[in-house]
Structures are given as C-alpha cells and as structure tokens.
C-alpha cells in the first residue's frame, strides 16, 4: 500500500513555487486586412514604429512605412504569396540592419546582405543599420586626396576627390557603367574598397560586370550588391542603403571606399511604386513628395572623415539615365543638385567614336580640383578651356569656307587633343602616363602626325619612357609635381620618338 508523506509533498510544492518564473512577454501583434502588389494592410500593431520590421505568420518580413489611424501600411520583402487575410503579424522591435565584416569582400549579395553567388554563408560578428545618419559638419574635412579613375579625360579635366559625390549622367548605351567599372578596375593596389550597387538592372548585365571584375582581379577589393529588375520594389529601394552601410563600415575603420549606385532613378521608380500602392499623394511625374529626401539622405552619407575619426573616406558615384538628353527631368535635376559635380556622357559623341563619350564643356567637378596632384594641374590646367574653344570653333568652321592659318592650326591642335582623350574600355592609365600624354598634346608635339597615328604613337612613347626613362615616373610619383628635370626629360625624348615614328611609318 502506497503511503503519502505530507512533508515530501510540501517540499515538492515549495520547490515548484521557488522555481516559478513570472516572466511575461508582451508581443505587439496585428491582423492582415488586405495583401497584394507587395503591400499589406494590418489592423492592430498599435505601438509599431515607422520603419520597424514586422514578421508575418509564414515568415515573410516587411517594413512598416505608413502609420495611419486605423491601419498600418507594410511593404513586403518577398512575394507574399503565402500571406493570408486574417493571419497574424508581430512587430519585431528592430529597424532594418545588416551584418557587416571584411568577409564580404569579393562576394555578390542581395539587399538583405545574403550571398547570391553560391559560395556559402558569410561570417560576420557586427551589424549596422541600413539607414544611419550622415556624418555631421564637425565629423568631416574638405576633400584633398585624388581618386584616380584611370580615364585621362576625367582625371585631367573633371577630377574626383576621395569623399566627393560625382554624378555620371547620360542617355542609355553611352558608356556610363563602363566609366564606373573602369574606375573600380583602376583602384587595384590603391588601397580602396569598392562597392558596386546594381538596382533594377538586367541579371545578364550584372553577371557581365562581375565577370569583368573577376577577370581583371578586381573582386578581391569589391563587393557587389545586386537587386535585379525582377526583385520586389522594396528590395530595389533598400539595395543602395545596404551598399552605403557596407561602405560606411570600412570608412569608419579608417579605410578609403568608393561606392557606385547604378542607378538611383530605378530606386526612385521602385519607391514611387511603393508610395502609390500605399496611397501616398503623388507629386511631379507621380513621384511622392519626399523623393528628394530619398536620394539626399543616401548621397549625404558619402564623406571625407575628419582626422579625429581617422580620415577614412566614402566616394559616391551615382549613375542616372536621361531620356534623349533631357537633364531637366525630375530625378536628374534632384541628383545634380545634391552631388558635387557631374560627368555628362553624350550619345552624339559616342556614335562619333569618341569614347569615353564625355562632354567636357558641360561636365564639372565642384570640389575635385582641390584633390588634383600639382603635376596634373601644371600640365592640364588649360586643356579644358582649349577643348571648349575648339568645339566652338569647329561648329563655326562648318560654315566658313576659307580659314586663316592660325584658325586652321587651332583646329588641328584641338582634333589631336580630342584624339588623345580617347581610351578603350578596361585600359586605365596611371597618373604618370596621363601627364606624359597631355603634355605631348598640349605642347604641339603631335601636330606633325596624322590624326589616325596619334594613338599608336602615344602607346609607343609611353612604352619607351617606361623602359628607357624610368626616372621620369619616379620624379612625378615622389614629388607629385612636374619639375624642370621631368620636363627636360620629356623635351629630349618626345622629338626623338616622333622622328623615329615618322620614319617607321614611311617604310
């Protein structure tokens, strides 16, 4: 017969009471009223914050964007096909953030920082908010170091500095992405981390860019963030902020970074789609009223850090596509007013075989000249003005039948200057090579040559100087100035080489 001992029972009850944990978890929940087109309307979620992540019953994550009196408008980070009306939603208490680490270098990721290159997970111990405030005035210093693109037309006449924001703008198929990718290729060995953000691009175009980076050995210092044309609007809207968060991680670790947004007008279209579906009032070109803020808060994150913060930098190169050269459209004017200058690419120049098709007359760099090395300033100082005058003169010369000798000479010089600015894709030039090239053209050494011979001669001259006059490169790279000694070396070498070249061409 079982005997019940009262003291044992009382001990068990006492233990249970001591172990009882009165922990209460409060979850902010709501119910799905309506779902479709990447948008969900939620009843409840009374204490949700603007921009807070919410989780649906079947696992989809969304962002609370519209906080209205009787419901919450949520944009979905997925297709939302499994979300049902009446299912529950809970607030997570978190704002969108991504993991960050050095391990992201060389990888292709999506807007949520998940790898999409099939090479396994990326380990990261830290995380950063996707949207973090831009550095304040005290945290910055003025731009003073050059970011060399390797493109002679840009580095000589529209220079970009580390920490600058320079817009690349032009019609479709004018080589905008090529300018940006060449800039990334030229950062090899320059200790610059590059982030390329593809927003709403064709998957084949992104694959082509990644292949170029891999072939040229640029992936080891590059991160590619890609949300292709078939991605949900929410992810296309988030992708640039994800790229900026990754670049900021390196900037605040005293590194130099360069970020390319290709292109923010696609992000604006995704944001317009989300806003219209959330029934926000449309404005000009049906964009919402805060589309300027969409881009300004993104591009203001590019900065040159102060010496107290380690002098890291983040250079932004947004790419904007225009429709038949119309730069007065809404998004182009917005981005032009936010950035520190713009590089215009012209379809007419591109079709005329001038590539990169940079329209030097209307391209500007508002702060880059402070970053240009002294040697380049000395040599290329007058080039931009000369080319602008040449373009004007060329237009005038079409109507004039007989031109005087001085005008003919100026036209011939201008044609040769324009010829030396032509450059094939993925063939960046060092600063020293650029200085030699411009000096040769600006001082009339190319005048005896036919226009078709210019490119061939310049290649020959650069090769000769590298092998026979290595001290020239050493002088420019060590002093950063174009000294009398450097000029004397060139004055000696160029006429010799021209004579030799002309003899070779005759035989």
From Swiss-Prot:
Q: Where, subcellularly, is it found?
A: Plastid, Chloroplast thylakoid membrane
**Which residue positions does UniProt flag as site: Required for activity?**
363
- Does Nucleotide-binding show up as a keyword for this record? yes
Domain of life, per UniProt, equals Eukaryota
Kindly state which keywords UniProt assigns to this record, in alphabetical order. Answer: ATP synthesis, ATP-binding, CF(1), Chloroplast, Hydrogen ion transport, Ion transport, Membrane, Nucleotide-binding, Plastid, Thylakoid, Translocase, Transport
Main localization of the protein? Answer: plastid
Q: What does this protein do?
A: Produces ATP from ADP in the presence of a proton gradient across the membrane. The alpha chain is a regulatory subunit.
Subunit details for this protein? Answer: F-type ATPases have 2 components, CF(1) - the catalytic core - and CF(0) - the membrane proton channel. CF(1) has five subunits: alpha(3), beta(3), gamma(1), delta(1), epsilon(1). CF(0) has four main subunits: a, b, b' and c.
- Name the HAMAP family on file: ATP_synth_alpha_bact
This chain's protein is named ATP synthase subunit alpha, chloroplastic
Gene name of the encoded protein: atpA
